Curated annotation (Swiss-Prot):
The keyword Transmembrane applies. It is a multi-pass membrane protein. The lineage of its organism: Bacteria, Bacillati, Bacillota, Bacilli, Lactobacillales. It is found in: Cell membrane. Its main location: membrane. GO terms for cellular component: plasma membrane. Coiled coil: none annotated. This is UPF0756 membrane protein Lreu_0946.
């Protein structure tokens, strides 16, 4: 029952915040909970969902290459500007943080609750996008490790 109340609260916050992605995600999870025998599928979705999401995002990012909107000239041009180098550096940093984030989420489930709350606040109050829980977890890992803190 508690999970339904929590999901309903998330749905209300998403509706109030006009965040269609969070509304859709919450409704999908609620529908999955309603369907008999899906309890065994939920852990699979939880475990593999981030990878599936990254795959979908990667496909979307590669489409301009496939359509010819982005080519090698654009790639070389990126290395000619400071902004291009910063973008490459941030891409590397995000990949590294995500690696630690995935490990952190698996090792310390309590982090998930705080990250979900932070993500909801960021999405609803600041019109952010819920694309960063793994990165946020990686950042949490780095700060917690740096400050020698524990959950």
């Amino acid at each position: 029952m508690e999970s339904w109340l929590f999901l309903a609260l998330v749905l209300l916050i998403a509706i109030f915040g006009h965040n269609s992605s969070l509304i859709i995600a919450t409704v999908i999870v609620m529908v999955l909970k309603l369907i008999p025998y899906t309890a065994k599928w939920l852990p699979l979705i939880q475990h593999k969902g981030i990878n599936w999401g990254v795959t979908v995002i990667s496909v979307a990012i590669l489409i301009p290459i496939a359509t010819g909107q982005i080519g090698f000239n654009d790639l070389w041009a990126a290395f000619k500007t400071p902004a291009g180098w910063i973008a490459v550096g941030m891409g590397i940093a995000v990949a590294i943080l995500s690696k630690y984030g995935v490990n952190q989420l698996a090792a310390v489930p309590q982090v998930t609750v705080a990250l979900v709350l932070g993500t909801i606040i960021g999405v609803v109050a600041f019109k952010g996008i819920a694309a960063g829980p793994v990165i946020a977890s990686g950042m949490t890992y780095c700060i917690v490790t740096l400050l020698n803190l524990h959950f």
